[in-house]
Regions:
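Short Gly/Ser/Thr- and Asp/Glu-enriched loop/turn motifs at secondary-structure junctions
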Residues: 120-124, 165-168, 302-306, 352-354, ...
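DNA-contacting surface of Y-family translesion DNA polymerases
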Residues: 18, 202, 210-354, 361-365, ...
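Short, surface-exposed beta-strand-loop junctions and turns on beta-sheet-rich folds
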Residues: 67, 315-317, 325-326, 431-433, ...
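C-terminal accessory/binding modules appended to enzymatic or scaffolding proteins
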Residues: 386-435, 442, 447-449
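A short beta-strand motif that forms part of the nucleic acid-binding face
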Residues: 166, 218, 323-324, 429-430, ...
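Intrinsically disordered, low-complexity mixed-charge segments
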Residues: 362-392, 459-472
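Gly/Gly-Pro- and Ser/Thr-rich, intrinsically disordered tail segments characteristic of DNA damage-repair
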Residues: 1-243, 375-379, 385-402, 410-411, ...
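Intrinsically disordered, low-complexity linker and terminal regions at domain boundaries
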Residues: 436-502
Length: 502
């Protein structure tokens, strides 16, 4: 991401509105969360490329470690393509039990800072520091951000990047600039100078297709986007998208940090690198988004009654469809099924550039009999098709179910052997399963191969990333991550200092 310009911008933006006078909105984004958790749990993978996601022929990458990203692997990429780019990476099925455990620790640290915490996913959240009584001064909020990073490292063994600004959009941009394992402060009053020279892709919701439309109109930077004016952007992109983009380019973002339990709806959406034209891929993405939405529902202790999908087509037209269930639910199968039914009512043949799945009508309980809402007439053949699509999406429920069927030894699965102790599945096939025996606090472990039905081998539970070593071991130390993800002694975020001074 480009840094701020050294001189003042020549374009006339007008005033930056809706930004607080102090950088009291914090955005935390854990670094390569799923992959980093796997590296912390598995000493033999530290410093090596790791890819977490669906591992089948139609699987999709959920998270790639920074070592894998060097080879071009990224989230939402088909796993088959990732294997071609980085054949020597460790490809692991997600372990959502572990990720939720770590997320709960991180969210507890955030709630200690403020009553207003807005989780966006298991590994990302906004925090209103002002509501937590932190003084509205740059030095004070910086100190809070740095202490948070240290606390996260101590409690989980992982790292997170922190952005601080006077508005949510700016705080998120700051945390992106801080990656990996850093802190960036955007001082109120410096927004125009900071944002102006950045590419339009910096702004939320601007994917390759939108950027190309703007490029053809001679608009390349945030400053040029603001200068173009709302009317021109509406002409190019449509009313909603054009007006919203113009406001963001001017730094206008008055959205409050909303505690998830106070939210009226919970939703997630993704803009794609290229328009999706394959119907199967569109369905897989909807399933993946439904899983993410369920994660947020459960993190907030909520359930919802109305399922909504959002589809933005190649021509920027945006459609929404909704279905109201008989009662509130947080069951992933119910929400996926409803989202797919809604998708079937939308024509996507021209190409899809954005998809979203949301749930509204929130409640504090789950109606247990909502499994009855699943379509019962689609039995064996339909179930097989859904299972294949869910594998492509790296779905939460599927992988949890796989963990409950121990004789299907998926890569990354926790196991325990009567003689060798705790370990994880490195691979399986032709009636054999290979296990590496190591723990988060051990040295890289040895490898053994067993028959898949070996009675001495059984599924295990995720081990704590910190504090779990035997007496006399390293129980007080976090797992040691690759050096580039570890802060140097005395490091207080020099990148943040540089940006906040400008």
């Amino acid at each position: 991401m480009p840094g701020p310009a050294s001189g003042r911008l020549s374009v006339a933006w007008g005033s930056i509105g809706d930004v607080r006078p102090a950088p009291t909105i914090l955005h935390l984004d854990m670094d390569a969360f799923f992959a980093a958790a796997e590296q912390a749990a598995k000493p033999s993978l530290r410093g090596k490329p790791v890819v977490v996601g669906g591992i089948g022929a139609r699987g999709v990458v959920s998270t790639a470690s920074y070592e894998a990203r060097v080879f071009g692997v990224r989230s939402a990429m088909p796993t088959a393509q990732a294997r071609r780019l980085c054949p020597n990476a460790a490809y692991l099925s997600p372990r959502f039990t572990l990720y939720r455990q770590v997320s709960e620790v991180v969210m507890e640290l955030l709630h200690a800072l403020s009553p207003l915490v807005e989780p966006l996913s298991l590994d990302e959240a906004f925090v209103d520091l002002e509501a937590g009584g932190v003084p509205a001064e740059t030095a004070a909020v910086r100190a809070v951000g740095e202490q948070l990073r240290r606390d996260i490292r101590s409690a989980t063994g992982l790292t997170g990047s922190v952005g601080l600004a006077g508005a949510k959009m700016l705080a998120k941009i700051a945390s992106e600039a801080a990656k990996p394992n850093g802190l960036v402060v955007i001082e109120p009053g410096t927004e125009r100078e900071l944002l102006g020279p950045m590419t339009v892709r910096t702004l939320p919701g601007v994917g390759p297709a939108t950027a190309e439309t703007l490029r053809r109109a001679g608009i390349h930077t945030v400053a040029e986007t603001a200068e173009a004016g709302e009317a021109e952007l509406v002409r190019l992109l449509g009313k909603a998208h054009g007006a919203g983009l113009h406001a963001m380019a001017r730094g206008q973002d008055d959205r409050p940090v909303v505690a998830e339990r106070d939210a009226k709806s919970i939703s997630v959406e993704d803009t794609f690198e290229v328009d999706l034209t394959d119907r199967t891929r569109v369905r897989s993405e909807v399933l993946r988004l439904a899983d993410r939405c369920v994660q947020r529902l459960r993190a907030a202790g909520r359930s919802g009654r109305t399922v909504v999908i959002k589809v933005r087509n190649y021509d920027f037209s945006t459609l929404t469809r909704s279905e109201t269930l008989r009662g509130p639910t947080d069951d992933p199968a119910v929400i996926r099924e409803a989202a797919v039914r809604l998708l079937e009512t939308v024509d996507t043949t021209g190409g899809v550039r954005l998809l979203g799945v949301g749930v509204s009508g929130l409640a504090d309980f789950t109606q247990e009999d909502l499994f009855a809402q699943l379509a019962t007439e689609r039995e064996a053949e339909e179930a097989a098709t859904a299972a294949a699509a869910e594998e492509a999406a790296g779905g939460t429920e599927q992988h949890e179910a796989e963990e409950e069927r121990p004789r299907r030894w998926h890569p990354g699965l926790d196991v325990v052997h009567d003689e060798y102790g705790a370990g994880w599945v490195q691979g399986s096939g032709v009636g054999r399963v290979t296990v590496r025996f190591e723990t988060p606090w051990s040295a890289p472990g040895r490898v053994r191969t067993f028959a898949v039905e070996d009675p001495a081998l059984r599924p295990g539970e995720p081990l704590p990333l910190v504090g779990g070593a035997p007496a006399g071991g390293q129980s007080s130390e976090p797992a040691i991550l690759p050096k580039f993800l570890s802060p140097e002694p005395g490091d207080t975020g020099s990148v943040g200092e540089e940006i906040s001074r400008r």
